[in-house]
A protein has these predicted regions:
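Charged, heptad-repeat coiled-coil alpha-helices that serve as long linker/dimerization "arms"
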Residues: 1-89
Length: 89
């Protein structure tokens, strides 16, 4: 049973790794950093329409990155739980 669980965890790990690529997490992180820098600039909020557009873009990027990071965290938790379960007598 433990071998099947480990295999399942490794399959999920591969899917999460694949998601990193097709979701372009590194690019989205760089884009978010650039947008956050724009948002932090003095006068950014003077143009309400532009500010709203940039804020929505940043929010969308943040949502995608946060969802990916949540999946990574769950994967780490699953691996840790599997390791702990293997230590029990």
């Amino acid at each position: 049973m433990a071998d099947k669980e480990l295999k399942d965890i490794e399959q999920v790990a591969q899917r999460v790794a694949d998601a990193h690529g097709f979701l372009h997490i590194d690019d989205k992180t760089a884009q978010l950093m650039a947008l956050d820098a724009q948002i932090a600039q003095a006068g950014f909020w003077d143009d309400a329409q532009r500010a709203q557009t940039v804020s929505k873009q940043a929010s969308s990027l943040r949502d995608t990155i946060d969802a990916y990071n949540a999946a990574v965290s769950l994967l780490h938790d699953a691996r840790a739980a599997h390791e702990l379960a293997g230590e029990d007598p």
